[in-house]
Design a protein with these regions (language model features):
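Hydrophobic or amphipathic, alpha-helical segments that drive membrane association/targeting
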Residues: 1-109, 153-210, 214, 238-244, ...
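Active-site recognition of the HExxH zinc-binding catalytic motif
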Residues: 56, 80, 118, 133-141, ...
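Short pre-active-site segment immediately N-terminal to the catalytic Zn-binding motif
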Residues: 68-69, 120-133, 204
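Short alpha-helical functional segments enriched in proximate histidine and acidic residues
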Residues: 83, 141-142, 196, 223
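Active-site scaffold of zinc-dependent metalloenzymes
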Residues: 104-127, 145
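Catalytic Zn2+-binding segment of zinc metalloproteases
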Residues: 139-158, 226-229
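C-terminal capping/extension segments of zinc metalloprotease domains
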Residues: 218-237, 241, 245-324
Length: 324
């Protein structure tokens, strides 16, 4: 794992690239097509802001979360309050998501406040020490304002996506009427340019998401005693258990809707387990974790990581173990 300073610089540079490329291309498009695209951009921004405000209610419905009282799970509240105090933030609301996949996520908006949700699958998979490390990771996301930052970073590619498809459909309309063929060709060109920019910005946004996962991991290590080993063991158990759950249940596709929120990507769990299967899980925990430092990520795995919101599991575990 790179140093905290390098992580911050990499995240800042990536965000600057996303903003810079977006500003440049939007300026070029507006210079050709005029202010009509401002309406499209403003509409997309308003829709995304509305989505951000109401997203917690949607997440609660999809993942069947419920608020739990301090008397119901005092040990979880004690962990959350301690980690939040060490992190210097107000204790978020604690919720349980009634789903079998072992995972956790942080979310919230000005309408709901900050929340940390733990799945019932996680409670059945990890011990309290590992749960504390996972909570430390999620609180790190809240402290770093990752929900807001990633919403903003994802908004810019979305603008180009909708602009691109709007222009392409507009060009088809012109072609169908046999009018303004010159304008139709220009719309197609700018539309395809917008789609290309969308894909480029999406790759940058995914990279930013992976950096912020490392940043949240580092935060957990800083506020949880022995957090590096606890979180590494927790991640291994999450991957192994998630792969089994996804094989057992065929109707979990909808639970991936907000997978970027999770501490581990449930969609890659089966592949991640393949990566880990080279290890002997009957070994002691120390021997198991020590083995990860000797492995290399293959070229195919590096390519797959480019399109993931989360770091490759082997790279992530190595990064954690380097902090022990």
């Amino acid at each position: 794992m790179p140093s905290t300073l390098k992580l911050k610089l990499a995240m800042l540079a990536t965000l600057a690239l996303i903003i810079g490329i977006s500003t440049l291309v939007i300026a070029i498009i507006l210079s050709y097509l005029g202010a009509s695209l401002i309406i499209i951009g403003a509409t997309i921004i308003l829709v995304n802001l509305l989505q951000w405000l109401i997203a917690p209610y949607i997440i609660d419905a999809i993942y069947r979360t419920r608020k739990i009282s301090k008397s119901e799970r005092p040990e979880l509240y004690e962990i959350l309050e301690r980690v939040a105090a060490k992190s210097g933030i107000k204790t978020p609301e604690l919720r349980i998501a009634d789903i079998p996949i072992p995972n956790a996520f942080a979310y919230g908006s000005p309408l709901t406040g900050n929340r940390v949700a733990i799945t019932s699958g996680l409670l059945n998979t990890l011990n309290l020490d590992e749960i504390e490390a996972v909570i430390g990771h999620e609180v790190g996301h809240l402290k770093h304002r990752d929900v807001q930052i990633m919403m903003f970073a994802s908004l810019l590619p979305a603008i180009f996506y909708y602009i691109g498809y709007s222009l392409i459909w507009s060009s088809m309309y012109y072609s169908g009427r046999g009018e303004k063929r010159g304008n139709g060709g220009l719309l197609v060109l700018i539309g395809f340019l917008s789609i290309i920019v969308y894909w480029i910005l999406t790759l940058f946004t995914l990279y930013l998401s992976r950096l912020r996962e490392y940043y949240a991991d580092r935060h957990s290590v800083s506020v949880v005693p022995g957090g590096a080993k606890k979180l590494a063991l927790g991640l291994v158990k999450i991957v192994e258990s998630t792969a089994r759950v996804r094989v057992r249940y065929a109707n979990l596709g909808s639970l991936s809707s907000f997978k970027a929120l999770f501490i581990a990507d449930p969609d890659s769990a089966i592949n991640d387990l393949d990566y880990l299967s080279k290890y002997n899980f009957t070994r002691t925990e120390s021997e198991l974790l020590a083995k990860y430092l000797k492995q290399r990520v293959t070229f195919a795995e590096q390519i797959a990581e480019l399109f993931s919101t989360h770091p490759n599991i082997i790279k992530r575990l190595k990064a954690l173990l380097e902090l022990m």
